[in-house]
């Protein structure tokens, strides 16, 4: 069955107007998550804050997850929040800021023995150096990361 160009055009107009109407509504799922987070406590609140931050990639939302983890003295959540914030900076904001923050966060994450977050943060840090074409520094940092991993495996 062949559709007329007019029918296709009308379908496209309806689709675009539906999309625009949805966009005009803001982020209803995020708004409801914010309401639930405001009424929640503990890990449940933190998980909701993480979902909000992942959906918006707004640095203020990542700050909220980090501050919540700090308030709860939850070291793994602090490390995860720092990593996610750094990756958000790297992907959506400033690579310079991501590099600075990663450099500052690495000792804390290593001392906390959160190795998965540590090596993910280090990898993001090195990727930032590559993105800035700082190849020699990236190579040196990759060597340092490898040596750190070897020391952890031989202990």
Regions found by a protein language model. Name each.
Residues 22-155:
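A "functional boundary" signal
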Residues 7-17:
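Bacterial N-terminal signal peptides
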Residues 1-4:
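Positively charged n-region of N-terminal signal peptides that target proteins for export
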Residues 6-7, 49:
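Short amphipathic alpha-helical "recognition" segments used for binding
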